[in-house]
């Protein structure tokens, strides 16, 4: 039985789309039709997204002080708003759910103006610019790492956690396998949607400094930008280290599950997936992130002992080599970190968010929803 349409809106990066994808699976399983509004960047993720239809609506980043660029952005947003109104009038969704990024602004503004129930999900510990614009207008705010009981919008904020995709939940079934002695050691390195250029230089340089006995144990899976890929491959070939290097892995969850150690950025989706799967991590927050949201995300995992957090400016090749040497020599410590990471993970986040969406779509309030969950 089709319960109606839920319209999801997300920016076209993995950090926005992955939690939207997880919610879409839950809503589809509950009998809803799901449509997605996004931008052209989402094309590489579209094959896995369980939407009945994907719509591209014009939007633009608002940040430039250049009057010409500002005028262009305003025109794009106005065009997107008109298109979003037409789309909502045609689909008649029961609710519109935004996951951040400027492509969510036109459909969420249109929905609030048309009286359609609205929810935003903020993945990070610090609210992003698009969600800040929308927070006062929407009926409910779901938080990945947002604190539930503080802030101007505490009354309508629910700490759902960050929904993770079915592939991540499947990978979470794989227990962590410590690798001591001469056992092979799988290192997984990735940089998220902001790219992995820093890791493309830092990690091979660090691996080069390892003792021969440690290098012989090492196997590497590493995300690298297309322009860096050949150089990274050559670095590992020179060291005779088996390595898979690619700009994008469709099966990243499974690769994380097979890792003894992960080195990565600390975007919200990344931290959530690593913690649900339960793998020890070296987190290097993206230093140019607005509001330092990645540092705040990383702190949540480090507080449970699931990760070490190191600022990029402090992570020299020599220091990273020392960290890798220590990690590969102390499997029990990594096992404890894996357990700490798993304690942080919220595997039921997608289901909880789906329940919140259903409640708001049916006309209920956040206060009533919280009462039913207490």
From Swiss-Prot:
GO terms for biological process: carbohydrate metabolic process; cell division; cell wall organization; lipid glycosylation; peptidoglycan biosynthetic process; regulation of cell shape. GO terms for cellular component: plasma membrane. It is an enzyme of class 2 (transferase). Pathway: Cell wall biogenesis; peptidoglycan biosynthesis. Its main location: membrane. GO terms for molecular function: UDP-N-acetyl-D-glucosamine:N-acetylmuramoyl-L-alanyl-D-glutamyl-meso-2,6-diaminopimelyl-D-alanyl-D-alanine-diphosphoundecaprenol 4-beta-N-acetylglucosaminlytransferase activity; undecaprenyldiphospho-muramoylpentapeptide beta-N-acetylglucosaminyltransferase activity. Keywords: Cell cycle, Cell division, Cell inner membrane, Cell membrane, Cell shape, Cell wall biogenesis/degradation, Glycosyltransferase, Membrane, Peptidoglycan synthesis, Transferase. UDP-N-acetyl-alpha-D-glucosamine binds at residues 13-15, 124, 165, 193, 294. Its EC number is 2.4.1.227. It is found in: Cell inner membrane. It is a peripheral membrane protein. SUPFAM superfamilies: UDP-Glycosyltransferase/glycogen phosphorylase. It catalyses: di-trans,octa-cis-undecaprenyl diphospho-N-acetyl-alpha-D-muramoyl-L-alanyl-D-glutamyl-meso-2,6-diaminopimeloyl-D-alanyl-D-alanine + UDP-N-acetyl-alpha-D-glucosamine = di-trans,octa-cis-undecaprenyl diphospho-[N-acetyl-alpha-D-glucosaminyl-(1->4)]-N-acetyl-alpha-D-muramoyl-L-alanyl-D-glutamyl-meso-2,6-diaminopimeloyl-D-alanyl-D-alanine + UDP + H(+). HAMAP family: MurG. Cell wall formation. Catalyzes the transfer of a GlcNAc subunit on undecaprenyl-pyrophosphoryl-MurNAc-pentapeptide (lipid intermediate I) to form undecaprenyl-pyrophosphoryl-MurNAc-(pentapeptide)GlcNAc (lipid intermediate II). Belongs to the glycosyltransferase 28 family. MurG subfamily. This is UDP-N-acetylglucosamine--N-acetylmuramyl-(pentapeptide) pyrophosphoryl-undecaprenol N-acetylglucosamine transferase. The gene is murG.
């Amino acid at each position: 039985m089709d319960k109606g349409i839920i319209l999801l809106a997300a920016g076209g990066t993995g950090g926005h789309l992955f939690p939207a994808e997880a919610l879409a699976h839950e809503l589809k399983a509950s009998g809803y039709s799901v449509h997605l509004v996004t931008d052209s960047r989402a094309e590489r993720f579209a094959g896995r997204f369980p939407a009945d239809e994907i719509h591209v609506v014009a939007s633009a980043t608002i940040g430039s002080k250049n009057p010409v660029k500002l005028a262009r952005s305003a025109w794009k947003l106005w065009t997107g708003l008109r298109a979003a109104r037409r789309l909502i009038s045609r689909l008649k969704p029961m609710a519109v759910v935004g996951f951040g990024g400027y492509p969510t602004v036109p459909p969420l503004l249109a929905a609030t103006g048309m009286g359609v129930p609205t929810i935003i999900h903020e993945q990070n510990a610090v609210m992003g610019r698009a969600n800040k614009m929308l927070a006062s207008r929407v009926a409910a705010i779901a938080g990945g790492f947002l604190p539930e009981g503080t802030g101007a919008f505490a009354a309508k904020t629910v700490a759902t956690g960050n929904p993770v995709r079915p592939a991540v939940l499947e990978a979470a079934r794989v227990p962590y396998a410590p690798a001591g002695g001469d056992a092979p050691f799988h290192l997984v390195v990735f940089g998220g949607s902001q790219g992995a250029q820093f890791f493309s230089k830092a990690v091979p340089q660090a691996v080069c400094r390892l003792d021969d006995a440690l290098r012989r144990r090492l196997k590497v899976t590493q995300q690298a930008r297309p322009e860096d890929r050949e150089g990274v491959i050559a670095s590992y070939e020179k060291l005779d280290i088996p390595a898979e290097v690619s700009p994008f892995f469709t099966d990243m969850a499974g690769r994380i599950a097979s890792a003894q150690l992960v080195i990565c950025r600390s975007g919200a989706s990344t931290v959530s997936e690593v913690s649900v799967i339960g793998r020890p991590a070296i987190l290097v927050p993206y230093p140019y992130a607005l509001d330092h949201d990645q540092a705040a995300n990383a702190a949540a995992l480090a507080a449970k002992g699931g990760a070490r957090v190191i600022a990029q400016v402090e992570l020299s090749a020599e220091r990273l080599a020392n960290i890798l040497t220590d990690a590969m020599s102390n499997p029990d410590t990594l096992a404890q970190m894996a357990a700490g990471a798993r304690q942080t993970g919220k595997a039921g986040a997608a289901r909880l968010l789906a329940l919140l969406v259903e409640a708001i779509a049916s006309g209920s309030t956040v206060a009533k929803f919280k009462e039913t969950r207490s």
